[in-house]
């Protein structure tokens, strides 16, 4: 069975992505590999993708886009600043940054800011306050001692930056993701539904089934989460930039709100940034980091993400092992009283959602040790994941891509099996395989969700003891060429 039900996303650099390394992370609990387009080129991506697929067809690959970000331009050497220093800021991507003038990549930067506005550079390490606004530049006062290097992030809390959702580099990377059949695209700085639809238009034009994860990194994204969830396939709570764009004391509350919204929408949610930050350079986490992981699970997140810990840290395998152990314990310790109740829409005839809820509820009343579903699209498995059952969901997938699309969903263990003539044969073959692999015992009780009619949504829930079901295997034949499960 699963090491833990919470999924783990790990950022891997093309500088450290050999097969043995990825295999160690996978064995430690890795489910999804994240590729950061800001730090690698095509040659590096080629190597990383090939090595991930060599290790396992179950590891999903998630590619980040840059989105509408603002950065400082290049400079000759790091520049030290002290509190009280005055410096000009201009919006010119082609101008080099100097001690006297910081240039940023957004041409209309001066226009969008006003006197009194705060500019946070390099994740807030360098803070500026606008003291004077001119037609072609801002005059700012430095608030703290810091050293500025090339191409650092620029955030302006509370100010809407009117940049297009997709850069030309993003478009090229999306086309590359389509070519390589990547599983997820995580789009940065999503502000509204249109930001997601811009990517969907590209994917649809190429008949791609890549899933889109919306990275929520500013107040506008938080405010528009409902409309974003209508069109996105999942959400990443990117606490790094979010903690700069909004007051940091609000982050725990926003995290809890976004997780709840995603569960109600039955879409996976990832909590990211500094989960085990000290393990970049230390073999053990702080107690606060352990508690942070546990609290994200108590809030009911689907997945947790590691960034620098696995991309360039000294203890990448230990970080994944630590996260796996903490997650497994937190799943045991979480209180059922805090489960998020998902109401069923009285005006909806969504049989899949209804049966998924009953299947998970049955695990609390009967000795059911797993819920099995055969799935073409993964929809039924994602519905089951939303109800956060105690026991795993075993999703038998017709396509390997579906298997990887479920790599972010809580408690779902996806297994690939070639499509069979009918659903019951599929079910019995799955039971035999799970018995052979030691995942189930003959006396275990299992729930089975499927469809009795070709081309329809999930239509029945069946509960059996494994050995009893297999005794009657030859007597049960139900057609299932389902494309909706």
Task: Show which residues each predicted segment covers.
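Non-catalytic helical/linker scaffolds that mediate oligomerization, partner binding
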Residues: 1-485
């Amino acid at each position: 069975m699963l090491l833990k039900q919470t999924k783990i996303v790990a950022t891997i650099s093309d500088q450290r992505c050999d097969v043995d390394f990825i295999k160690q992370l996978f064995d430690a609990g890795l489910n999804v590999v994240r590729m950061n387009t800001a730090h690698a080129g095509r040659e590096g991506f080629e190597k990383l993708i090939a090595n991930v697929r060599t290790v396992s067809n179950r590891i999903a690959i998630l590619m980040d886009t840059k989105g509408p970000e603002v950065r400082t331009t290049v400079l000759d050497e790091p520049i030290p600043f002290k509190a009280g220093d005055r410096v000009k800021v201009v919006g010119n991507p082609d101008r080099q940054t100097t001690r006297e003038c910081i240039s940023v990549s957004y041409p209309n930067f001066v226009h969008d800011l006003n006197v009194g506005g705060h500019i946070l550079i390099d994740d807030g390490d360098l803070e500026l306050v606008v003291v004077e606004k001119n037609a072609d530049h801002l005059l700012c006062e430095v608030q703290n001692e810091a050293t500025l290097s090339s191409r650092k992030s620029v955030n302006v809390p509370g100010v809407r930056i009117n940049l297009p959702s997709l850069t030309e580099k993003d478009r090229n990377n999306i086309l590359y993701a389509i070519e390589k059949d990547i599983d997820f695209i995580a789009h940065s700085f999503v502000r509204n539904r249109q930001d997601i639809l811009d990517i969907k238009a590209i994917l649809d034009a190429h008949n791609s089934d890549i899933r889109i994860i919306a990275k929520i990194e500013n107040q506008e994204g938080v405010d528009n989460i409902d409309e974003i969830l209508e069109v996105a396939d999942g959400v990443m709570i990117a606490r790094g930039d979010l903690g700069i764009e909004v007051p940091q004391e609000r982050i725990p509350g926003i995290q809890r709100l976004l997780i709840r919204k995603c569960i109600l929408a039955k879409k996976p949610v990832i909590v990211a940034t500094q989960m085990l930050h000290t393990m970049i350079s230390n073999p053990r986490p702080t107690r606060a980091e352990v508690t942070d992981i546990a609290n994200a699970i108590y809030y009911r997140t689907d997945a947790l993400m590691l960034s620098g810990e696995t991309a360039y840290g000294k203890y990448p395998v230990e970080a994944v092992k630590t996260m796996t152990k903490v997650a497994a314990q937190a799943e045991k310790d979480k209180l059922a009283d805090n489960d998020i109740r998902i109401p069923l829409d009285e005006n909806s005839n969504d049989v899949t959602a209804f049966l998924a809820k009953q299947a998970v509820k049955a695990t609390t009343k009967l000795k059911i040790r797993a819920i099995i579903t055969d799935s073409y699209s993964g929809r039924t498995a994602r519905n089951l994941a939303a109800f956060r059952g105690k026991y795993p969901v075993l999703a038998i997938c017709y396509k390997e891509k579906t298997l990887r699309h479920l790599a972010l969903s809580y408690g779902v263990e996806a297994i690939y099996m070639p499509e069979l003539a009918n659903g019951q044969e599929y079910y019995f073959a799955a039971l035999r395989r799970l018995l052979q692999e030691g995942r189930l015992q003959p006396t275990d009780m299992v729930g089975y969700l499927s469809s009795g009619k070709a081309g329809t949504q999930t239509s029945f829930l069946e509960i059996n003891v494994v050995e009893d079901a297999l005794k009657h295997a030859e007597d049960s034949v139900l057609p299932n060429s389902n494309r909706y499960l």
